């Protein structure tokens, strides 16, 4: 290398470092207002109090949390945990979630080929998984649960008795429907502290069941509610 070019290379190296620093993941933290994580950008933590959070298709972020607002994640996202208090959480296909997915008042849906490294839990709301792997537990107090075709829950599935110590819980007079779909697997126990109607597909595999009597089925979908 011509030594006369050394200063030029040094300047280029410093410029590259500066550019890398500018592109480093940044946190977004606000009290009021929605947050959107755009595809092609790297984000740190996403936090708001009053507002929704959106992760566009292909977006990358750390944990995303809000108090009053929904969380909507597109296809092929990668994030930390997703949590809200008042709002649902919806993730598209092939989501990679490096933590738990949790809400209090709202439903949770994880699309096909998703991966969740933590738990999937809500208090008032339904849970739906499609060909999704959950490393932890799946649980709710008041809501239907569908462990859809090809899903794999490595922890337990639990439906808890509502607690008077928490926020008011909407209690339906209808039994909750718990569906374990074709080819689905729940490694841990299935524990029910409330009356539920539990459907388990003939091709599914589940752990020990307590608090409910499973109803086997062999059709692509569970029997309609009219037969509950």
For each predicted feature, which ranges?
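Intrinsically disordered, low-complexity terminal regions
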Residues: 1-228
């Amino acid at each position: 290398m011509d030594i006369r070019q050394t200063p030029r290379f040094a300047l280029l190296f410093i410029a590259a470092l500066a550019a890398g620093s500018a592109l480093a993941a940044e946190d977004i933290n606000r009290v009021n207002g929605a947050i959107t994580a755009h595809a092609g950008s790297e984000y740190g933590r996403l936090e708001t109090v009053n507002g929704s959070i959106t992760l566009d298709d292909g977006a990358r972020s750390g944990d995303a949390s809000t108090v009053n607002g929904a969380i909507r994640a597109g296809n092929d996202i990668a994030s930390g945990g997703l949590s809200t208090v008042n709002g649902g959480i919806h993730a598209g296909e092939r989501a990679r979630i490096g933590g738990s997915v949790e809400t209090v008042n709202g439903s949770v849906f994880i699309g096909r080929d998703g991966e969740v490294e933590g738990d999937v839990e809500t208090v008032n709301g339904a849970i739906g998984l499609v060909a999704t792997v959950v490393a932890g537990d799946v649980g709710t107090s008041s809501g239907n649960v569908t462990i859809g075709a090809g899903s794999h829950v490595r922890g337990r599935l639990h439906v808890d008795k509502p607690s008077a110590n928490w926020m008011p819980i909407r209690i339906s007079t209808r039994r909750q429907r718990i569906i374990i779909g074709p080819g689905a697997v729940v490694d841990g126990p299935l524990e029910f502290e409330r009356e539920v109607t539990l459907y388990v597909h003939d091709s599914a595999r589940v752990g020990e069941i307590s608090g409910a009597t499973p109803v086997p089925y062999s059709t692509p979908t569970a029997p309609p509610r009219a037969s509950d």
